[in-house]
Amino acid sequence: MIVNIIGAGLAGVEVAWKLLNTGVKVRIFEQKPKKFSTVHKNPNFGELVCSNSLKSESLNNAEGILKAEMNILDSLVLKCAYRCRVPAGKALAVDRDKFSQCITEHILSFDNVEVIREEIKSIDLKEDEIWVVATGPTTDGEFANWLSNLTGGFLNFFDAVAPIISGDSIDFNKCFFADRYGKGTSDYINCPMTKEEYERFYKELINAEKIEMEDFDRKLLFERCQPIEEIAKSGEKSLLFGPLRPVGLIDPRTGKMPYAIIQLRKEDENGNMYNLVGFQTRLKWPQQKRIIRLIPGLENAEILRYGVMHRNTYIDSPKVLDEFLRHKKFQNLFFAGQITGVEGYVESAATGIFVGINILRFLEKKELVALPTKTMLGALLNYITTSKQLKPMYANFGLVDVKMGKKEKREKLHKICLEEMKKFLYMLK
């Protein structure tokens, strides 16, 4: 039986990786390069369209626990992330082009994979084939209409991406390398601002022209990817407690903490490109250039990619899917990735691993399995398939139901999660 996967993003490639390694015939439908969404540029698989960071690796962090669980389950995304990483303190950041190339090469190395570079418009749900919808949050066109009819409509939210600038256009005489509180390996470039410089920047930011979006609703902005200009609307000091917070950073030229800081993170290993951390925006492009050049050290910044906003689409999973991320009516149709309501690169990839595991069991005529809810991934999947009012969700400590205080959870939860995941893997074998 052939397994058809629609979409070769982070979720789709994890499903494929799990199946291909066991000899299952896989057919991947990927519309790139014939058709690109508004945020996709690279024809390779596993393209990162927002930040190049896969968040923290620390086991005192929910994202770090999720990565550790995925490593137990043999994640292709993490395998390539480690191979293509760039310095980013405690975060796992990657050279996005090398990362996508790595994933693509791994998938195409199998003889039992067929890749069809075409846009899918609908699915014939005949019972002799399995289908996986992993089309991501930018699902659109005729397929989106077909899927909407199948699932009873979509839920939506908006998020934005940050600009990327050329490394050789940064004036390093006005910036300094450091990580907060002196932790890490000083991988971030910090652009310090005085009170006067910040006030000028803030005034220009809130008065800058924005690109209008159809049906835009500020209440539908995803909290992690809010445009910087929307955060600024909350008050003049809102950025000082958000993306421009200076805490934990000392300017070596003054020996003092600056009034505000804008951080830059490497996009590639050689430092040819940097992204502005927390600077997601939907300002008009000439306005982005003008305002970025108000930042000390970036007066001559060359923008390689401008920030943009896009609408993200996901299905109402509790109504549509069972606990295995399978359609409640069509037993040969699975879903994976952000289309299910998870949020984040790692979270999306993790759902693909889970779906791959259960498709293998389906093919072997075994009972499908749910993950223990005392794993980070299991708790996340439980949320998106049972929530009474689904909102996009990323890995966090609140999902895992254990009787611990906040401090104890941060220190000990990883032991419980990883032990449960190892037991799950042993049960599979």
UniProtKB/Swiss-Prot annotation:
Keyword tRNA processing set for record: yes
Write down the chemical reaction(s) this protein catalyses.
Answer: uridine(54) in tRNA + (6R)-5,10-methylene-5,6,7,8-tetrahydrofolate + NADH + H(+) = 5-methyluridine(54) in tRNA + (6S)-5,6,7,8-tetrahydrofolate + NAD(+); uridine(54) in tRNA + (6R)-5,10-methylene-5,6,7,8-tetrahydrofolate + NADPH + H(+) = 5-methyluridine(54) in tRNA + (6S)-5,6,7,8-tetrahydrofolate + NADP(+)
Its annotated function is as follows: Catalyzes the folate-dependent formation of 5-methyl-uridine at position 54 (M-5-U54) in all tRNAs.
- Keywords carried by this UniProt record: Cytoplasm, FAD, Flavoprotein, Methyltransferase, NAD, NADP, Transferase, tRNA processing
Q: Which family does it belong to?
A: Belongs to the MnmG family. TrmFO subfamily.
Q: Name one GO cellular component term.
A: cytosol
Gene Ontology MF annotations: flavin adenine dinucleotide binding; tRNA (uracil(54)-C5)-methyltransferase activity, 5,10-methylenetetrahydrofolate-dependent
Location(s) in or outside the cell: Cytoplasm
Q: Which GO terms describe its biological process?
A: tRNA methylation; tRNA wobble uridine modification
Query: What's this protein's name?
Result: Methylenetetrahydrofolate--tRNA-(uracil-5-)-methyltransferase TrmFO
Q: Does the keyword tRNA processing apply?
A: yes
Task: Report the superkingdom from the record.
Answer: Bacteria
**Could you tell me which species this protein originates from?**
Thermosipho melanesiensis (strain DSM 12029 / CIP 104789 / BI429)
Amino-acid positions noted as binding FAD in the UniProt annotation, renumbered to this chain: 7-12
